[in-house]
A protein has these predicted regions:
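Hydrophobic, aromatic-enriched alpha-helical segments typical of multi-pass transmembrane helices
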Residues: 1-174
């Protein structure tokens, strides 16, 4: 996950941040080739795709000692992951960009509007994305507190999880 995060930051620093408007998305996708696609936040998508594996590993680690906490964490992480993946905007914007490029001038404003709707409801702006953040980061914070009460994880690991995921959890609300 750290590698995905570092790659995402590197892409942002080298190529620019993810586009903010539908017109910018369409321009970047149509004109910037691979660089345009890289700016669509696929690193975050890949990172979130790894969360179910972490959820299963945490469940396995705690299913004997704290079965209810393990199951709750598993459910929170899986629900959050599902919501986040279902609301990532990259594939929708790629599709709309292709339609926009082929559309007559009269139809292009409709496709720009459709693109703005996708942005407004994506994993960074929409209700499902908000809930995904609460479920995923809340699940990680919760299991980090559980780690404090077990001997299988060091206190440093638990506190690191609380701090890192706690900050990300707060980010959901800010």
């Amino acid at each position: 996950q750290l590698a995905c995060l570092v790659v995402g930051i590197g892409i942002m620093l080298l190529l620019g941040a993810e586009p903010k408007t539908a017109a910018e998305y369409f321009r970047v996708i149509q004109n910037d080739g691979l660089a345009g696609y890289l700016r669509l936040d696929f690193a975050t998508l890949l990172m979130i795709t790894l969360f179910p594996f972490i959820a299963v590993a945490l469940y396995a680690a705690f299913r004997q000692s704290r079965p209810a906490y393990a199951l709750l964490t598993l459910v929170l992480l899986l629900l959050g992951t599902l919501l986040a993946l279902a609301n990532h905007s990259a594939f929708s914007m790629i599709h709309l960009s292709k339609l926009y490029a082929a559309a007559p001038l009269a139809q292009q404003p409709q496709l720009l509007t459709a693109g703005e709707v996708v942005i407004a409801t994506d994993m960074w702006h929409g209700t499902a994305g908000f809930l995904a953040g609460i479920f995923m980061q809340g699940g990680f914070v919760f299991i980090s507190f559980v780690m404090l009460r077990t001997s299988g994880f060091s206190k440093g690991t638990a506190y690191t999880g609380i701090l890192a995921n706690g900050l990300d959890f707060l980010h959901v609300f800010i």
